Amino acid sequence: MSDQQLDQPSLSHEERQHEENKLIAQRKEKLAAVREQGIAFPNDFRRDSLCGELQKQYEGKSKEELEAAAIPVKIAGRIMLNRGAFMVLQDTSGRLQVYVDRKGLPAETLEAIKTWDLGDIIAAEGTLARSGKGDLYVNMTSVRLLTKSLRPLPDKHHGLTDTEQRYRQRYVDLIVNEETRHTFRVRSQVIAHIRRFLNERGFLEVETPMLQTIPGGAAAKPFETHHNALDMQMFLRIAPELYLKRLVVGGFEKVFEINRNFRNEGVSTRHNPEFTMLEFYQAYADYRDNMDLTEELFRELALAVLGTTDVPYGDKVFHFGEPFVRLSVYDSILKYNPDITEADLNDVDKARAIAKKAGAKVLGHEGLGKLQVMIFEELVESKLEQPHFITEYPFEVSPLARRNDQNPAVTDRFELFIGGREIANAYSELNDAEDQAERFHAQVAEKDAGDDEAMHFDADFVRALEYGMPPTAGEGIGIDRLVMLLTNSPSIRDVILFPHMRPQA
């Protein structure tokens, strides 16, 4: 049985599993033979070149030029194709062919090559050459096995197309799917660019606790754990906000953190319990400054990753090069729902009825501001396709944000929506310690009334504010959702290397 025999679309799942088990047994026999000959997994080879880089570096060299230059190279990679005389190797940079010179290679090497399988990792030395078809290859003068692969790669007919298996076996997904490798290279580029962008503007990168005694900084349900040595309940953080603002109090006037947050909530194409968030804070700035900074960041990211400010996503194109729309929560409800009037939004009973009809989970004790946000979430969010800054969130749902000077019923806050998804949340920070204490008390009352996502009272944070925090603007940006946009990925699981899954039966 060979990999080619397994590569038959007519096989049923049971037949395919049976044949795969036979292949694994054969490969284990081959590994046993290699063990008898000496070191089965050598680690003394050092390459001097990468496959993809060689392709780029010598793209313009002709067959005759390469033959005259006789450029020696050492490469290593995984066998992805085996055509007998030629094998295709893949490393982190790309693919390159190697030529099995039956006249130039020792007889024992040629015999060993016959036992190699797709997925095996080999080391090759030789000179660069170009085929009659124009393909670059390495004319091998020596080659040896570095790692024996015991499991066959997915065949070319079926591949690794089952979405759940791609998430569960990301290592295989990365081997066989260039699109997946590209997605995570882009993710790395995005994070590196954000760091550079903020560093250039004087921000200091910091790290704050993942384990917290009081989960704060967001309206979310936390994961709970127990610290054995201290014999106390602790929580995985839902946000780093309150610690970052403590640092602003301490004199670090521009700080940021890129790290994980944890929220014990639902799993969907937009939500993962463990996710990556950028949060940054700058003193002597307000939420409007953050809107300007965010537009600049998103334009630079699109240009750096895509080479354009037009971002394709599904059947849409988002325009990062144009000014982002700025609209209040209140005005956005009226704009996108012409059947709702200002009188409806300003009446608690009418607003409650609209929220219930829209499908919101109304408990009955909500104030007018919270009801307006519920209506917005149900009837507006999904309609915000192009980038929208939604501003002036009611203070009831913004316990950490500064009230607006002209209208104290709302806060100096915005959320950024693109493609109907929240990408960022920001506000001018509340730095009035007494107001903050009152809002924490109101949140505790909400929690006592049954709101699992309401905040705890954080006395130490109030104490920090009592020392005085300068006027400050802060923002959180979801890295995963941002990468989804920039890689045209439909699910958040597509941009997280190892997303959470239920255990297999």
Curated annotation (Swiss-Prot):
Span-the-membrane segments of this chain are none
Which GO BP terms apply?
A: lysyl-tRNA aminoacylation
Residues engaged in binding Mg(2+) 1:
E415, E422
Q: Annotated region Disordered: where?
A: 1-23
Cofactor note as given: Binds 3 Mg(2+) ions per subunit.
Record EC number: 6.1.1.6
Give the Pfam families listed for this entry.
Answer: tRNA-synt_2 (PF00152), tRNA_anti-codon (PF01336)
InterPro entries named among the record's database cross-references? Aa-tRNA-synt_II (IPR004364), aa-tRNA-synth_II (IPR006195), aa-tRNA-synth_II/BPL/LPL (IPR045864), Lys-tRNA-ligase_II (IPR002313), Lys-tRNA-ligase_II_N (IPR044136), Lys-tRNA-synth_II_C (IPR018149), NA-bd_OB-fold (IPR012340), NA-bd_OB_tRNA (IPR004365)
Which catalysed reactions does the entry list for this protein? tRNA(Lys) + L-lysine + ATP = L-lysyl-tRNA(Lys) + AMP + diphosphate
Q: Check the record and name the SUPFAM superfamilies matching this protein.
A: Class II aaRS and biotin synthetases (SSF55681), Nucleic acid-binding proteins (SSF50249)
Enumerate the GO terms in the molecular function aspect.
ATP binding; lysine-tRNA ligase activity; magnesium ion binding; tRNA binding
The residues listed in the UniProt record as binding Mg(2+) 2, with positions renumbered to this chain, are: E422
Cofactor(s) required, per the database record:
Mg(2+)
Query: Which NCBIfam families does the annotation name?
Result: lysS_bact, PRK00484.1
PANTHER family xref list = LYSINE--TRNA LIGASE, CHLOROPLASTIC_MITOCHONDRIAL, LYSYL-TRNA SYNTHETASE
Q: Quote the protein name from its UniProt record.
A: Lysine--tRNA ligase
Say which species the protein is native to. Answer: Ectopseudomonas mendocina (strain ymp) (Pseudomonas mendocina)
The gene designation is lysS
